[in-house]
Amino acid sequence: MTHMPARPVDGAEPLSALPAGPMRQAGTQRSGIYEISKVLTAPARLEITLANVVNVLSSFLQIRCGAIVVLDAEGQPEIAATGDIPPSSQSAARGVIPKAVIDHIATTGMPLIVKDVSKSELFQAEPQPPWSSGTVPISFIGVPVKADNKILGTISIDRVRNDAAPFPADEDVRFLTMVANLVSRTIRLHRFLNLEGRRPIGEQERPEKPIIAQRGAPGRHPPVKIDGIIGDSPALQQVVETVSVVARTNSTVLLRGESGTGKEFFAQAIHELSPRKNKPFVKLNCAALPEGVLESELFGHEKGAFTGAIAQRAGRFELANGGTLLLDEIGEISPAFQAKLLRVLQEGELERVGGTKTLAVDVRLICATNKNLEMAVANAEFRADLYYRISVVPIVLPPLRERPGDIPRLANALLDRFNKENQRELTFSSSAIEVMSQCYFPGNVRELENCVRRTATLARSSSIVSSDFACKNSQCLSSLLWKTDGSPGGITVDGHARSNVMPTSSPRSGGSIGASDEVSSVKACDPHGSGCPAMESRLTQRDRLIEAMEKAGWVQAKAARILGLTPRQVGYALRQHRIEVKKL
C-alpha cells in the first residue's frame, strides 16, 4: 500500500493556523466520552460496536456524517463503520473515505483538517465522491487511531461548512483524539481474542437488536458464576460477562460505581479468573493514607530514608510482582503523586523512597473509584495522561436500585452469614422480603447488610416480619438520605459528596445530555415515589420507551439520549413495540 508523503495538503490547513473558538461546552464532551465508553464495553461484535460509536458521535457533534475505518496488518481497510449504513468490510470501506485520505492520515500519524473538500486533491482522486454535496462547502476532520505508535485505523467526521461561524477544529480534534484512544483499546482487545481462538464478543448478536432488548434477555450467554457475587439480574450478569472476558488479559481495569456496589469483590474476581491467580493479590486504599505514607506504601523505602525507617521495606508494587494490585479510591490521590504513579505505569520501573536502584515490576493493575474522573480531568484535578493509562477497560458496576430482583437473594445470604456468626436460625418472612425489595438503599449492598444485621439483632422471634424493620417504626436514619434539597427540616446530601459521584448509568432527566456543565448524579429520593429510579427499573421496556419519548416531546434523538441508546435503536424499538409516534 503506497502512502502519500507527509506534506501540506491543498485545501487543508495545519491545526495551529485555524481559529480556536470553543466548539461546545466541556460538559458535552465529558458526557460524550462517558456514553462512548459504555458502548465500547458492551458485549457486541467489533463492527457493531464501532457503528454504535459513530451513532453516539452524531448525537454529540454537529456533523453531516462520521466514519471509523479499521486497517488490517498490511494497512488495507478491513472494517468501515458509519452511522448511515451497516458496517462494511474491505470492498465497501474504500467508498466511505477516499483511499488517499486514509493513506495520508496513516502515513503522517497526525490529524488531517480540510476546510473545503472540493479544493483538496485528496478528495478528487476517486470518481463520483459520496462526500460531495454540490455547491455546498463540506469540511473534513480525521484523526488516526493509534496504539503503541501503530496505526490501527482512522476516525473522521465531515459537516456542512458555515462561513458565518468560526471553524471549530481545535475542539473537534481534541475530542476525536480522546475517542480514538478509547477505540484503539477496544480494537486491540478484539484482536487479542481472535488470536487466542476465542469467539469474538457478541459474535452471534443481531446488529439490529436494540440495547433495551439485550438487557432484558437473560440467557443470551451461559451465566457465569463468580464466588462472592450474588445475583442474576441482567445488569449484574452483563458486568460478570465482561469481567470474565477481561480477566484473561493483562489490560488495566477501572472499576467504577457508587459506594457499596462491590468493587473490591469484582477486583478479586478478575484476579481469580486471570492467569495470575496463583500470584499475589495486593490491595491498597489510596484515600486512607497521606501522600508521604502512600508513596512509601506503594514503592517501598530504604533503611534511613526518613525518620523511623529502621529497615528496608518492599512496597505494594514489589509485593504484587507477577500478580495483581488493586488501588482503591484512585481518584483521591494528589496531582504530585499522580505524576509518580504515571511513571511506574508507563515504564514498569520504580525506585524505593530514599533509594537509587531501579526495580522492574510486572503487575496487573486494577483501579477503583466512585469519583467522576472525567470532571476531575476537565477541572485539572486529575491528569489526563494518567486517566488514559488506568481507564483502558472501564467497568461500571450497577447500583442495587437497578437490580431489585437480586435483593431477596442478597438478604438471605447476609442473614445466613449473621446466623453462622451468632449461632442463630433466623429466617425472613415473605412480608419482610417485600419491605426490603421496595427500599431504595442509597448505600447499596453495604446499606442492605446494615439493615439485615440491625433487624436480625433486634428480632424477637425466629421469623423476621415487616414490623421488625426500623423503617416501619419511623426509626430508620438512612431514610433521611431520601429527603431532597429544600425539604422542611430534612437533611440533604453534602454538595461535595454529590460532585464525587460518577455519572449515572443512564440519564433520567428530560433534557439533552450535556445541556449543563455539571454531570448529573443520582439524587436520593422517596423509594415509594413514582420518580424514584428504584421503581423505574421495574417498568416494562415498552413503558420506559413511551416515558422517554414523552419527556423528549416525541423527538427520537432526545429520547435516545435519555435512554442511553442511539436514534436508530430507538426507531427500531418503536417499530418493534408498535408505538405510534405522536406529532406535536
Swiss-Prot record:
It comes from Rhizobium etli (strain ATCC 51251 / DSM 11541 / JCM 21823 / NBRC 15573 / CFN 42). Signal peptide: none annotated. ATP binds at residues 257-264, 320-329. Required for activation of most nif operons, which are directly involved in nitrogen fixation. A divalent metal cation binds at C471, C476. GO terms for molecular function: ATP binding; ATP hydrolysis activity; DNA-binding transcription factor activity; metal ion binding; sequence-specific DNA binding. Residues 458-541 are annotated as: Inter-domain linker. It comes from the Bacteria. Residues 1-24, 495-518 are annotated as: Disordered. Residues 542-584 are annotated as: C-terminal DNA-binding domain. CDD domains: AAA. Residues 45-187 form the GAF domain. This is Nif-specific regulatory protein. It holds the Pfam family Sigma54_activat. The gene is nifA.
